[in-house]
């Protein structure tokens, strides 16, 4: 329970009258400790640690797209995305207090889905990281040497604790998946969908992935 300065003064006077100045000092110290513990923190994070339950899996992807994929261990040196050069997910994350996990789904004849997810120390850190990634991908709308490229970013959800954005991908003007960036609470993630699915399916997958990441 927080006490006002006036309440502290009254409490001090009462305690001093009964038990002396030492008791009053102890009451004041107790209040300070309680107040310090109750101060709001920008480092609020979900209670549960990251796990495989927080990343998309074969069943979820099938439910959204109707495409069957097999899960494999992701490459630890996975780059951020197909058009951001050698930049990795780690390169854009905060330097301290971060835990990462990942997932890779592989289909027949080449299609794949790679998700990279991280737990930061605060909602602010996660949102700032997501915004930086959106900027990086927005600057490289096309991949040199081919017909593959991204369209303009589309915001699926945006509020104080959640942001979900995707870039529709095209190959020779045909829909070819997309790139998802999201932050939910103190978590931030990206999903590279290299599959011939529609933009509506990518948008649906983006929302579902954010929901799963925030569990």
How should each PLM-predicted stretch be described?
Residues 120-125, 156-161, 184:
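A short, structured loop/turn motif at beta-sheet edges
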């Amino acid at each position: 329970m927080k006490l006002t300065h006036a309440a502290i003064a009254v409490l001090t006077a009462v305690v001093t009258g009964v038990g002396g100045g030492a008791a009053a000092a102890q009451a004041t110290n107790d209040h300070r400790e309680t107040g310090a513990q109750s101060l709001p923190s920008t480092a609020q994070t979900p209670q549960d640690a990251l796990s495989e339950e927080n990343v998309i899996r074969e069943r979820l992807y099938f439910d959204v797209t109707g495409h069957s994929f097999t899960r494999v261990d992701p490459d630890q040196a996975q780059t951020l995305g197909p058009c951001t050069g050698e930049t990795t997910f780690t390169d854009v994350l905060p330097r301290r207090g971060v835990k990462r996990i990942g997932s890779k789904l592989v289909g027949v004849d080449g299609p794949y889905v790679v998700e990279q997810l991280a737990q930061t120390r605060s909602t602010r850190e996660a949102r700032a990281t997501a915004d930086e990634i959106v900027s990086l991908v927005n600057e490289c709308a096309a991949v040199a040497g081919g017909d593959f490229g991204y369209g303009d970013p589309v915001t699926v959800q945006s509020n104080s604790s959640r942001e979900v954005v995707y870039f529709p991908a095209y190959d020779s003007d045909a829909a070819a998946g997309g790139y998802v960036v999201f932050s939910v609470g103190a978590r931030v993630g990206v999903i590279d969908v290299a599959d011939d699915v529609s933009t509506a399916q990518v948008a649906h997958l983006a929302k579902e992935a954010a929901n799963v990441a925030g569990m």
